């Protein structure tokens, strides 16, 4: 069964993100076979063609992405923002740490990290995760799946729900070193990108061919 996702509240998305033309749309598509089958957030352009978090030609401006989503909420599940080398914006992804029904954290360690970091914080589409948009001088991704912590400076897009918890995008670069565990592995974000076969997507869905770059959280 297709998972439920939170609707997008465009009014609460920070202007610091809206004014940057690095937006995509995304749709939940079931990929894989048998026990490996899972729902994946595949990026798309407003015309329905595949988008890539490493190809600026497939990105668009905020208003175009918003219009495409609002005009066809069945085709698109939401919108997303791409991180790149153009600026110092980074994304912090905290997995399985939040209960949207009680509007509270379920992981004390990740809650402490989130409340200590200056940035715009919102609930993920699933309602169980938290994303933070901030600024930092970071060259590589830092990933610790055991702790549910991922930090990306480029080559990724984050879904954006506008389901704001608190905070705003800071103007100054933040020192996030204390928030990255020593065991957290540095990764080249481009190596973490993977191709997925989209042939099992819904009929008529634009993701076709042998595979398309899916770099998202």
Locate predicted features.
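Conserved phosphate/metal-binding and DNA-contacting active-site motifs used
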Residues: 1-194
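Low-complexity basic/metal-binding stretches
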Residues: 184, 188-217
């Amino acid at each position: 069964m297709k998972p439920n996702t939170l609707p997008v509240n465009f009014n609460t998305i920070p202007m610091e993100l809206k004014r940057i033309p690095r937006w995509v749309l995304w749709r939940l598509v079931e990929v894989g076979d048998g026990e490996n089958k899972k729902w994946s957030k595949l990026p798309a352009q407003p015309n329905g063609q595949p988008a890539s978090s490493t190809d600026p030609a497939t990105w668009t401006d905020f208003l175009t992405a918003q219009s495409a989503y609002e005009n066809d909420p069945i085709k698109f599940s939401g919108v997303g923002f791409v991180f790149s080398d153009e600026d110092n914006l980074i994304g912090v992804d905290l997995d399985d740490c939040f209960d949207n029904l009680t509007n509270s954290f379920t992981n004390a360690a990740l809650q402490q990290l989130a409340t200590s970091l200056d940035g715009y914080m919102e609930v993920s589409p699933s309602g169980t995760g938290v994303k933070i948009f901030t600024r930092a001088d970071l060259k590589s991704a830092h990933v610790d799946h055991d702790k549910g912590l991922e930090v990306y400076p480029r080559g990724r897009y984050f879904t954006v729900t506008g389901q704001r918890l608190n905070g705003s995008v800071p103007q100054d670069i933040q020192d996030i070193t204390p928030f990255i565990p020593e065991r957290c592995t540095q990764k080249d974000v481009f190596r973490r990108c993977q191709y997925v076969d989209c042939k099992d997507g819904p009929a008529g869905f634009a993701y076709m061919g042998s595979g398309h770059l899916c770099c998202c959280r």
